[in-house]
Structures are given as C-alpha cells and as structure tokens.
Regions:
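Acidic, small-polar-rich N-terminal luminal/periplasmic segments of exported/outer-membrane proteins
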Residues: 37-172, 518
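Gram-negative outer-membrane beta-barrel transporters
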Residues: 26-27, 442-443, 536, 553-633, ...
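Membrane-embedded beta-barrel scaffold of Gram-negative outer-membrane proteins
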Residues: 299-302, 306-314, 318-324, 475, ...
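Acidic/polar loop-and-plug regions of large Gram-negative outer-membrane beta-barrel proteins
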Residues: 210-214, 227-233, 237-300, 320-358, ...
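Outer-membrane beta-barrel translocator/receptor signature
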Residues: 137-140, 151-228, 234-238, 293
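Surface-exposed extracellular loop regions of Gram-negative outer-membrane beta-barrel proteins
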Residues: 250-263, 391, 473-517, 529-552, ...
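Structural signature of Gram-negative outer-membrane beta-barrels, strongest in the C-terminal barrel
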Residues: 231-235, 358, 377-382, 386-388, ...
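Face-selective signature of the C-terminal outer-membrane beta-barrel domain
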Residues: 295-317, 347-460
Length: 697
C-alpha cells in the first residue's frame, strides 16, 4: 500500500493535535445505547446495562425476554481482538472464526447458524467477496442478539445477528494514541480524539494505520481507516449525529483451501505433508484489496417525555479486487492428487480473478410512545418504517493449470484480468413494524411485535412476509426472572436455482425460521448476571451447494440447544465471564448439514492490582473451547478434533500512560479449525503477540 507510511505519520499527528485531559472510556449517545452506567453505591459500583438492539428502545437486559450480549470495546481489546470475528469469541452460543482466521471476511455462527452483521442497527453486508471487513477500533461495543430478530430488523438470519455500534462524539474533550508492534511484523498507529467545540457541538476522529504481514507468506494485512463524526445538540430535545468512514485494505487470503490429504490426513504416496501455512498463489497477484466509503446520519427528537422520533440513514460505496488460487481437492476428495498424476504431488490449481462493486442505501425511522393504561401498567409503543436498497456488480476471469503443489513454480503461474461486463444484482426492501413493550407493576414485561416486509429483486422476483414476536419475562424473587419467547425470521435470497449445467431454474424461495425459547435470568447482585436458556429453531429453504455443481434448497431443518452465560464485574477491579453453548441440527434428508461443533465454552477473567505511585497492574487470561465437528458426504465423514486455546493480558497503567501485552493462542496450539468432507481444510491461527504503548489525554 503506497500510502501506508504517510498514513502512519498522519494518524500520529491527528492524535496529538488535541491537548485536553483524558476523561476515561468513550461514552456514546445514550439514545443509541446498550451501555453500562455506573453509579457509586454503598461500597461498590452498580452496573445497570440496557440493551438497545433487542427492542430498539433503551431497556434493561433484565426486562428483555431474549438473551442479548453487550461486549464493550475495552473487553474485546483486552482479549486481543484484531477482527470483528474475534470480538465475539467469549459469548455464549457463538462460534467465532469457524474456518480459522480469514482476512477477507468476518465469520461467526450463532446457535450453529450463520449470523448477519449489522452496523448501527442497519445491515451493511449483502454479498460475500464484495466488500472489506470492518475495523473493531471504530466501534464502542458489539451487541449480539441470539435468535431471530426479523420483526425489528427485517431480513435477518435465523440464529441471530451481530450489531456493531459506532463511536460517536460526546461533550467531553479527550483522546488517546496507541502504538502497536506485534507478530508477523505488525506495526500500527491508532488514534481516537473527541473534541467538545461548544456546549452543544462536538466532533470525533477515529483512525488506524497498519502495515503488517500474516502467518501465510505473501499475504499482507495492511489498512488505513479514518472515521470522522460530528454531533450537534440543536436543542435540549434534538440531537443530530453525522458519521463518515474511509477505509482502504490491502490484504489477501489466509484461507488457502488446502487439501485434506497432505494436511489433516497423510499423503502416503508423496510421503510428506504440506506445511499448514502453505501459500498456493502467485505473490503480488493474489490479493484481496478494496475500499469502503460510508456516510450516515441520525436525528433524535423528543417532542415530550412521552414521544420520541428517531431517524437514521446510511450510504455505502465499496469496491474490491479479489484474485486467488486454490487446489482442486474437490474432484476426488479422498485422493485428489491421483486425478492428475501418480506421484502424489500433482494437482490442478484454479485461478479466480474478480472485481466487485457494492452500493447500499439504508434508512430506519420510528416513533416511540410512552404511556400508561392503568395503575402500574406502562407501555413503550414503537412504530417504524425502514427501507434498504443494495446493488452488487461483479465480473470474473480465471483458468486452471497443473502444478506440483509441494514445489510450485510461482513465477510460471498464469494471471488473469477481468475485463468483461459486470453481472449486476439489486434488491429493494420496505418494511413496516410495530412493537409494544408492556411493563406490569415493575415486575413483569411483555413484548409483542409484528412486521410486514416487501422485497423486490432485479430479476423481477417479489417476496412478501409477515413476521411476529412475543415474549414475557417476570421477576419472581431472589433475583430470578424466568422468560419465554416466540420469534420469526425472514431472509430473501437473490437469484435462481443453479441447475449445474449452465442453466437456471426457479427463483430461490425466501429462507424462513421460527424459534421457541425458554430460560431464566438470575441477578443476585447488581454486578452479577446469569442467564440460562433452551431453544428450538425450525428453518426452511436454506441454499445448499451440491458436490456435482449447482444448488438446491433444503426442506425443514431443526436445531435444538442450550446456553448458559454468567458475568460478574466490579468496575476497575475484577471481571469474570463464563459461557457454554450446545446446539444440534437435525435434518431428515441431509445429514451433511450438521458440521458445526455442538459444544462451545469459554472463560475470561481480569484482575486489577494497585502499585506504587498510583500505578495499576491488570492481568487477564481466557480459555476458549470448541468441540469436535463432523462433516459428512456420500463418500466419507471427516471429524475435526476439538481444540482449546488460551489468551492472556498484562497491562500496566500510570497517570496517562498504558503499556499492554496481549497474546492470543498463547500456547501456540496447532489445530485445524474445520475440515470439510468436500475435500479442504482450514487451519487455526497460530500464537499472536502484540505490544501496545498508549497515551490518553
């Protein structure tokens, strides 16, 4: 990236351009909150956490009949997160990086199902390999809604969604600068400056510049990110926030799609194994490089204590160049090298080149009414309308050649340049929703909601759906609050059935799902919360990719599971998070779909100690466990073993300075994240160590 060193210097200059005093953690607009508010009590601090994403209203988590997880930036940075996928690995029922670290996309499964990613309550990814990944430093927190959420968010995934909440200005002047050096020659400068220009006007600048390699040769991980925002409180009742983002990535693919034979299983003919981090492409040509430009705004106006208007909109313009190679381990997964020779080394290598452009416009607008209908009966009535339009255009080129995968002549590999017309697909979605949160005598909460969606695709395909949600939670004493909920989901699928012979059939049917869930939340003290829940999900019309080529759609799939999540926090002193999740998918006709680990567990804890001269030492450690996974096809089954990784943190802070050492996969466990019966394997990321020198002002 030609601008990398200029950007490093520029980010440093930006961060040092302000000179006020540091005022602690970032505090974003309470109107978009799911934040922790600390009030000093009798001898300890009390944490009241509200969840916005679960209901689009500020509601205490103990009043939500659905599990919602809020992960603050301080938490996931302490855990050593370097991607959005990493931020969610200590959440119950969430599998982060199911195919290992992937520099191209963020991957996470919620309740065994792929989860959609939202930004500030609006979906921001509509196609694989058409945009670059989001930067975790640009967000104040990550929210996870487990279970369907279509009533509020429209087209959504069945298992749940991950919502990223952007950093926005407040009216306290402060800032920070961080210098990072780490594994794979990672060099970074990060800056976050918040300036209060007046009592009702503030700006914020968040930036990152990174020059880094990865554990795979010839795959860089370079980034420039700059996110300005401005907040104007026009009146005491009117709040306006404008946000922007420019991000440029120059990376490749850490997922090399290596054959099972020669990695996970022995290659008895060749008599040797491939290195687990083998690069199979052409240096300088294989790349995943793109740019994302975003602009958005939010207006909140309170007409009175009883009526509030919220308006949001965002536009995304992104482009991407994606060139890659991968071996043909799919024609004969059990012996891929025998297809092209007898030496156990020769295989076909496919080169794919693509250019992609993506444009997205989203808006979400609602009115909230607070009123009472009797003694001790309070309502939060939400009525809203949202609209989104997205267009994705791609063009392709590529070819195949025969290579010795153990000794590739990289210079001889052919390259391709997409020059043909772009293949375009677009989609429009309009939704109307209504939700009523009813609170009875400050002990029982009922949530009722309904939504109507209309989706139109560029092929003329039209889908309509009505989805519902209902839930109840009530406090029965001793901090126990049992809950029950029913939710539905609706996800239109663009395109048509691929017949596998170059022709296409009927349009895809929308994916739909329903979920029943029952559980209990226990809050014995204000700083402790335990949630246990059991669920059953029924899913229809998942798109399936056939081994012989082409696609089809599933019939009915059923997923059952159980989760338990516990947290105990004393701000500034101690933190403990413990999670366990179990899920199992059943299909009457296709056993190959149950390939995700059934068991996921994690434990994370930090403790802060006082040192001399007001210095503090914070130590942290965590363990993440993923159970074995089984991938099945008509010819064989592949069992990927369970794995356990350890993370650690050591941090010293003194006055405005901070020195931190983060390590993920501390013991350097060399594991496979997933091996698929179709023929390829994905390795887990090795140990990553980062040192951070930070200054807050």
């Amino acid at each position: 990236m030609t601008v990398r060193m200029i950007a490093l210097c520029g980010a440093a200059a930006l961060a040092f351009s302000a000179n006020p005093a540091w005022a602690g953690e970032s505090t974003d607009d309470a109107a978009s909150a799911a934040a922790a508010e600390a009030d000093t009590g009798a001898g300890e601090e009390t944490i009241v956490v509200t969840g916005y994403t679960g209901t689009k209203t500020d509601t205490a988590l103990m009043e939500l009949p659905q599990p919602v997880k809020v992960i603050t930036a301080d938490q996931y940075q302490a855990q050593g997160a370097i991607s959005i996928s990493d931020t969610v690995k200590y959440a119950a029922g969430v599998l982060a990086n199911p195919y290992g670290r992937d520099t191209r996309v963020d991957g996470f499964n919620v309740r065994g199902l792929d989860a959609l990613q939202f930004r500030d309550g609006m979906r921001d990814i509509f196609s694989y390999y058409a945009s670059i990944t989001s930067d975790p430093y640009n967000f104040s927190r990550v929210e996870i809604v487990r279970g369907p959420a279509s009533v509020l968010f429209g087209q959504g995934s069945i298992g749940g969604l991950v919502n990223l909440v952007s950093k926005t200005p407040d009216f306290t002047t402060r800032g920070e600068i961080n210098l990072v050096y780490g594994s794979d020659d990672r060099k970074e400068v990060l800056g976050d400056v918040n300036l209060a220009l007046a009592g009702n006007l503030a700006v914020r600048f968040v930036g990152r510049a990174r020059d880094a390699d990865t554990y795979v040769d010839h795959v860089p991980d370079d980034r420039v990110m700059f996110a300005p925002s401005i907040r104007w409180q026009a009146t005491p009742d009117t709040d306006i926030v404008l946000t922007g983002l420019y991000q440029e990535d120059d990376t490749g693919s850490t997922s090399q799609f290596l054959p099972i034979i020669g990695t996970f299983r022995p290659n008895t003919v060749a008599g040797e194994q491939l290195d687990r981090y083998t690069f199979v492409g052409k240096a300088g040509w294989d790349r995943y490089a793109g740019r994302s430009l975003q602009g958005g705004g939010a207006i909140t106006h309170r007409f009175s204590d009883a009526v509030k208007l919220s308006l949001k909109a965002r536009y995304i313009d992104s482009d991407l160049e994606y060139n890659t190679h991968y071996a043909d381990s799919y024609t004969n997964p059990q012996d891929p090298f025998s297809v092209y020779g007898t030496d156990g080394r020769t295989i076909a290598l496919t080169a794919d080149a693509s250019d992609a452009r993506m444009n997205v416009f989203s808006t979400d607008n609602n009115l909230q009414f607070n009123f009472a209908t009797g003694a001790g009966i309070e309502h939060k009535l939400l009525v809203g309308i949202d609209y989104s339009w997205n267009k994705v255009a791609k063009r392709y080129a590529g070819g195949d050649e025969i290579v010795d995968l153990y000794d590739i002549d990289y210079d001889a590999l052919a390259t391709y340049d997409p020059t043909g017309p772009f293949i375009k697909e677009s989609q429009k979605q309009l939704g109307i929703y209504v939700q009523d949160q009813i609170r009875f005598r400050d002990r029982v909460s009922v949530v009722l909601g309904a939504r109507r969606d209309r989706v139109t695709g560029s092929s003329g395909q039209k889908d309509n759906a009505t989805t519902f949600r209902a839930g109840i939670i009530g406090e029965i004493g001793a901090g126990f609050s049992p809950f029950f909920s029913y939710t539905e989901s609706f996800l239109p699928v663009a395109g048509r059935i691929d017949n596998g012979d170059g022709s296409f059939g009927d349009p895809y049917r929308p994916q739909t799902g329903t979920q029943y869930e029952a559980g209990v939340k226990w809050q014995p003290t204000p700083n402790t919360l335990v949630t246990a829940t059991a669920f059953k999900i029924k899913e229809r019309n998942r798109v399936l990719y056939l081994a012989a080529g082409g696609t089809t759609q599933s019939g009915e799939l059923n997923t059952k599971g159980f989760e338990i999540e516990a947290s105990h926090t004393l701000p500034g002193h101690f933190e403990l998070l413990a999670n366990y999740g179990y899920s199992k998918l059943r299909s009457e006709t296709n056993t190959s779909l149950d390939y995700m680990p059934r068991h996921i567990a994690s434990l994370w804890s930090t403790r802060t100690f006082g040192l001399v001269d007001e210095a503090q030492l914070r130590l942290g450690a965590g363990v993440v466990y993923s159970g074995k996974s089984v991938s099945t096809s008509d010819i064989w089954s592949i069992v990927t073993p369970s794995r356990t990784t350890v993370d650690a943190l050591a941090e010293i802070s003194w006055n405005n300075w901070r020195l931190a050492i983060n390590a993920t996969n501390l013991l350097n466990n060399k594991y496979f994240a997933s091996c698929l019966a179709r023929g390829d394997c994905f390795v887990g990321a090795p140990r990553n160590v980062m040192g951070t020198l930070g200054y807050r002002f």
